[in-house]
Amino acid sequence: MAQVNHVENHLESDIHLSLIPSSWGSQVRELHMSDCHDAGLALAHSFATDPLSLYLLGVDGAASWSSEKLWKLHVRLMKYSYASYKLRGVATSIGPDYDAVALWMPPGTTNDDWIATLWSGIWRLWYLLPREGRKRFFDEVFPILHDTKAEIMGNRTDDCYYLGYIGTKASARGRGYATKLLDHMIYKADEDNRAIYLESSHVRNNKFYAKFGFEIKKEIVLTRGPRPIRLYCMVREPQNDKSSTSVADLGTDKE
């Protein structure tokens, strides 16, 4: 059935009218569990070419699945990850269509337990991932991330801010979204006098983080694929200088 817009002529003179809240394009907002589908899909797009994501799904030849099947699994992994972090942590976004998303675990919280694994759906990956991907995810990546964080942070491992994911869609990069998401939580971390810990999955992003005060403490090398995948463990100590940082948005990263 054709539908006529009777107010078309009245509105055509004002092309700026929109039902999308204008603040979404410039302000960081906290997400909810009900945002799981949209935020998870946004993260999937942000990390579609991420070295760690490709490694976990065996795109290097470990899995002979079709690209469509791998994409659907990638989306599920990101939705499960979102639920795992949002259960006890904080999820933030900026942009009119979840253009950039960050997942955080504040001090005193964790998603590294069986309750979060079961509730979020992460446990389903044991059955959904290809055989080699399952080994990489559960036997290699999970343990080494946990152990390395404990080694670096020591008795502060549960008393720091942990940036699990921060990703910007390819279509929204260069707008400073990642900077705003980081600044939003850095301000809180400095107020709390707490360090921030992350794992960078691409060397090109290390300079981006360095502008915020992050320093590389250790490299993790994943070796189950045909070429090694490197993760860079970085820490930012609390700083008293509250002057704002303005740097370019260099893309996405897994922390």
Residues covered by each model-derived region:
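A short helix-loop-beta-strand connector motif used in the catalytic cores of GNAT acetyltransferases and
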Residues: 66-93, 100, 158, 162
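Conserved active-site alpha-helix within GNAT-family acetyltransferase domains
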Residues: 179, 191-193, 202-219
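C-terminal "cap" of GNAT-fold acetyltransferases
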Residues: 198-203, 222-255
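A short beta-loop-alpha structural element at the N-terminal edge
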Residues: 27-41, 49-52
